[in-house]
Amino acid sequence: MFQLTSTIKENATLEIGLSEVKKPVPGADDLLIEVQATPINPSDLGTMIGAADVTSIRSEGSGTDTKLIMDVPESVMWAMKPRIGIPMPVGNEGAGVVVDAGENVKHLIGKVVSGVGGGMYAQYRVLPAMSCIEMGEGINPRDCASSFVNPLTALGMVETMKAEGHTALIHTAAASNLGKMLIKICNDDGIELVNIVRKKEQVKLLESLGAKYVCNSSDKNFKDSLVEAIKSTNATLAFDATGGGDLSGIILSCMEIAGRANMTEFSPYGSTHHKQVYIYGALNQSSISFPNNRSFGMYWGVGGWLLTPFLANAGMEKNIELRQRVSNEIMTTFHSSYTKEISLVDALSLDEIMVYAKIETGKKYLINPSL
């Protein structure tokens, strides 16, 4: 069987190719899944491409022997030392049909399941049954390929909001599959949500999904509209997928302006309600910048947010609850759309990688290793 791997070499190059490996054998509590659908998420590209220079890409070989090669800047090679020479399997999540199973989970043979555990860009994958979600009748692998990363991230944002005492959310890159899920969750759960996009057509799209507050960062009155949306919702927590540039700083500044509007007494430290931005993506590779005048007071925070530690801290009961909701709503709230379905060999095409590596909203690729 073949699986897609990414390897950093001693000569400061990264190589992506297909490795031929033995079909895995399931243990007593494991499932052997024929993978039929696995999405290309930004987190997958972090392993597949990482800090390599995509503009230096070249191709060698053909078919299953194709190798994509890119240069890795010498300045980051020190951080890559632990993975030099090690073929790293790629693909965080996916779905397929159970073709074999351990003695304790034989009842799942023939079932469609989604799973998470890495190495999903492969024809077959063994995963613990506990890492999988069994799907109902009529659900195919394409329908449930994205059952973990985006759905649980969106749900995790809402859970984080509740745990930290906030009452409304701000979300950037809101026209993404994840953003659409978050709109549906917040509408269903009665949570105010401010959506930030960067194109006029994205505003109309999200409004058609029921979004009440959509701010276009490309508009000249973006900051004013964001302040008004924050005043209306009292949003003091934001999740930023861009991870670079000045957007996080703008959000904090607009939160502060909205917060000061409700102050009855002056404070040299700004509004007293804590304002928080969590960065959970890296769509913008530039440095994060804040206004020179620190226009958001002193009650604020910026940090990273990751799904894995959130789930680890949430506990088993909450994990089961969230996964069950995803399973119940996989064709509605958590349904994902894809631009194109490609094979493992197609994923090594120069033309294809130059599209899916851009991580553009509305251009989501799905790999079908069974093709």
Predicted regions and their residues:
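Short N-terminal strand-loop motif that marks the start
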Residues: 1-90, 366-371
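A glycine-/small-residue-rich N-terminal strand-loop-strand element
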Residues: 76-117
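A structural motif shared across PLP-dependent enzymes of the aminotransferase-like
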Residues: 117-130
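C-terminal boundary of histidine-terminating zinc-finger modules
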Residues: 143-144
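Mid-domain Rossmann-like dinucleotide-binding core that forms the NAD(H)/NADP(H) cofactor-binding site
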Residues: 147-220
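Adenosine-nucleotide cofactor-binding segment
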Residues: 188-265
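C-terminal substrate-binding/catalytic core of Rossmann-like NAD(P)-dependent dehydrogenases/reductases
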Residues: 223-227, 231, 281-341
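C-terminal hydrophobic helical "lid"/dimerization subdomain
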Residues: 252, 258-262, 308-371
